[in-house]
Amino acid sequence: MADERTSDSVKTRYDIALMKLNDIKIAVFRDSLSTYVEQKTGLTIQFNWPKSRCLVISTLCKIPFPTKSAAELQEMCSLLLCCPERLQLLGYVSVWGEETRDVCLTKTLVFAGEDEKFYGLDFVNETLYLLAETTERFAVLGLRRYDPVYREKDIRFLTKIDDVLQSLIDAQDNLWKFATIVYKNSGRHYIMKSCLENNDGVFVLFLTRKEDFPSRMEWNFFSDVYESMPYDGQVIGSIGKTLLYPKTMFVMMDLSGAIYGIDTIGTGIGSCVKIADDFESFLRQGIVRGYRRYKFFHRNINTVQEILPLCPHTSLGPTFSNNYIYDLSSEDDE
């Protein structure tokens, strides 16, 4: 009965969001979005995920936090995006509630692009995220592709937080303290839910030290893993489908606390890819960024382990079936 109520709740949010987003789609196609935004300023659209967030339609002058000028925002987006595309401001992300318009930890602006695409801009850190390629997909996904949302404290974790994980979260800014806790709890494992992928994984904690390996061959394998890491860092565990196959991806942390993944499926060692900003975000986000990326950013020495997404103007991701929304159970509904 509880599962049925959850499915009904998700479907209702999806239907309402899609209805309102379709009005935006029509305005874009009629080249009248600016008029729509002016007339609908203050309108809220609750996201399917997370349900605690909403899109507030707003003109730039009525956004309740300091931003940049329209020209500066347009220039930033054009420099970040892979191809020229006209982006028009829709509004900003806020906390959902009848009485509140509190803004979130990350100041996020939402833009409508061409051909039904939607983007989220973290203008403080100058990063742009492709939120969805179509109106229907935006209604389904909400902010799932927007990495900064996983830093918000009210977003639920993918696994139950026990004393060990809490101590690791508290020590995430100190790699050596973090590594000591991992070493003391080596072999401890956690089921990490993956609502979007419908593919739960097992996160196993372990610390790699040379004296722990029975053979030189196995240590040489891990030496290859370490050579793939960006800076001084430490393997802290792995994620796999089951305990029998626990090493689908090695999980690492660097000195700054960022989390990386190295894919081990197939032959050899895959490239090292940043998958989360810190351990706490990783426990909310999982390893999905090791395989799918939607973040556009400036290339520099600090982003060498990040991979730009596929160009959305020439290729689209997987399409969703009509029954997809019924299978999508948000963890914040549990």
Curated annotation (Swiss-Prot):
UniProt keyword Transcription regulation, yes or no: yes
InterPro entries found in the cross-reference section: US22-like
Sorted UniProt keywords: Activator, Transcription, Transcription regulation
Entry-linked Pfam families: US22
Function: Isoform 3 can transactivate the human immunodeficiency virus type 1 promoter.
Family, as annotated: Belongs to the herpesviridae US22 family.
This protein's name: Protein U17/U16
Organism: Human herpesvirus 6A (strain Uganda-1102) (HHV-6 variant A)
